């Protein structure tokens, strides 16, 4: 059987478009990219890095210098805080969730370790790309900063002593 190259190309283009649209929905449903139009999100998807991780992979260690923010497109990642005697899971993050944002806004050391719980596909935004967005006064950067500020505000309110 001989396959028509046009049909094969069309199938792979369709599969790629379907995957991109799925990722686009995941991003638009997540808190980091809330309020950013689909056209701008499509551009962002092209510019950012996708990387697959296997269960058990460590994305970063507590105490490391951070250079990127991550968005879970598929799978799950747990954020673990180590103490002198053991470690405890702070969060388990699924599709649409993001982590590592302190690297972009605070240039701080990682406060916890990120471990892949189930095989995961992550979208990575490096510090240099984020800095470029801000320098360009991009509408994407303004919205991301507002969304990060909201997340920080929610976190502070949730953890205030009563």
Question: Where are the predicted features?
Answer:
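Cytosolic regulatory regions built on CNB/CRP/Popeye-like sensor folds
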Residues: 1-162
């Amino acid at each position: 059987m001989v396959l028509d190259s046009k049909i094969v190309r069309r199938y792979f283009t369709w599969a790629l478009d379907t995957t991109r649209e799925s990722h686009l929905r995941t991003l638009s449903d997540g808190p980091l990219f809330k309020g950013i139009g689909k056209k701008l999100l499509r551009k962002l998807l092209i510019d950012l890095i996708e990387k697959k991780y296997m269960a058990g992979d460590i994305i970063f260690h507590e105490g490391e210098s951070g250079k990127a923010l991550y968005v879970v497109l598929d799978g799950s990642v747990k954020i673990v805080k180590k103490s002198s005697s053991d470690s405890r899971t702070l969060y388990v993050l699924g599709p649409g969730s993001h982590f590592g944002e302190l690297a972009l806004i605070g240039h701080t050391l990682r406060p916890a370790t990120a471990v892949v719980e189930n095989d995961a596909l992550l979208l990575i935004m490096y510090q240099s790309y984020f800095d470029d967005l801000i320098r360009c006064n991009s509408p994407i950067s303004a919205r991301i900063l507002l969304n990060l500020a909201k997340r920080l505000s929610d976190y502070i309110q949730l953890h205030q002593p009563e």
